[in-house]
């Protein structure tokens, strides 16, 4: 298990062992407890970004489907019905994509935030990898929000604290990589003898522009997304389970 701190305070978790589910879920819970105050009761909205009809883009929706949603139970029946004295109020939404709704995701979430007034928004999305080594092997947690679609050049309005007026945590996993990155990584060892500027010039000449719009995903993406989404949802459930005294 490898942990590293990346720019914008993004925490990455990489693992090469297939039997990592429980360990990674615990790490996700620990990191979430570090970036948000879960010592007191919070109202938390979890947003599953992406298109559930496209496997590589369905990470967010699958995470929300596996969450322990509690807000409605607490509102209707009170904490006693759940046998708890304290509990976070968890709600979830799968907003779909603009082609399905005709609305920006940010518009939908802004409306929900204005109506339900959560303390924190957690947004989960599939990402585009900048390296083939990170594909399906890195979980990024950031406290600076998330920009839906930006990894594949489909720039939408970001889900950030500035836009929503509440703290936004972003969680992402790179599930696709563009063809140009595959070519770049494949040729990297061959070009080690060249200076960095020469490498860049050579690759720009070699890589056709259309390769930057062609995205590739592993053949086992169905099973991988199912596994990753369950691992993340269990991490969230663990993080939300206990509240300090």
Predicted segments with their positions:
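Active-site cofactor/substrate anionic-group-binding motifs, chiefly glycine-
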Residues: 1, 17, 21-40, 67-70
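Single conserved hydrophobic/aromatic residue that forms the stacking wall/gate
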Residues: 2-13
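A glycine- and small-aliphatic-rich helix-loop capping segment at beta-alpha/alpha-beta transitions
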Residues: 31, 55-73, 138-147
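Short glycine-rich or small-residue beta-strand-to-loop segments that form or flank ligand, phosphate
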Residues: 43-54, 92-96
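Gly/Ser/Thr-rich loops at beta-strand to alpha-helix junctions
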Residues: 49-59, 99, 126-130
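A structural-propensity feature for long, helix-poor, extended segments
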Residues: 81-112
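A structural signal for small-residue-enriched, beta-sheet-centric alpha/beta enzyme cores
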Residues: 93-94, 123-245
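Proline-aspartate-enriched helix->loop->beta-strand connector
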Residues: 113, 118-119
């Amino acid at each position: 298990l490898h942990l590293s701190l990346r720019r914008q305070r993004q925490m990455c978790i990489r693992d090469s062992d297939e039997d990592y589910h429980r360990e990674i879920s615990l790490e996700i819970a620990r990191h979430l407890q570090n970036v948000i105050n879960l010592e007191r009761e919070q109202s938390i909205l979890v947003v599953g970004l992406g298109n559930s009809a496209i496997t590589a883009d369905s990470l967010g929706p699958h995470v929300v489907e596996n969450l322990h949603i509690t807000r409605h139970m607490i509102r209707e029946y009170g904490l006693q019905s759940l046998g708890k004295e304290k509990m976070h109020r968890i709600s979830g939404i799968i907003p779909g994509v603009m082609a399905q709704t005709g609305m920006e995701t940010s518009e939908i979430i802004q409306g929900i935030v204005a109506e339900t007034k959560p303390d924190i928004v957690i947004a989960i999305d599939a990402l585009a990898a900048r390296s083939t080594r990170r594909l399906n092997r890195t979980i990024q947690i950031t406290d600076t929000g998330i920009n839906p679609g930006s990894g594949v050049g489909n720039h939408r309005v970001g889900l950030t604290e500035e836009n929503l007026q509440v703290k936004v945590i972003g969680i992402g996993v790179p599930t696709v990589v563009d063809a140009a990155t595959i070519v770049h990584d494949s040729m990297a060892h061959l070009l080690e003898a060249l200076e960095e500027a020469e490498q860049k010039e050579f690759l720009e000449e070699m890589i056709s522009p259309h390769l930057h719009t062609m995205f590739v995903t592993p053949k086992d993406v169905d099973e991988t997304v199912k596994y990753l989404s369950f691992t993340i949802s269990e991490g969230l459930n663990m993080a939300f389970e206990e509240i300090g005294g």
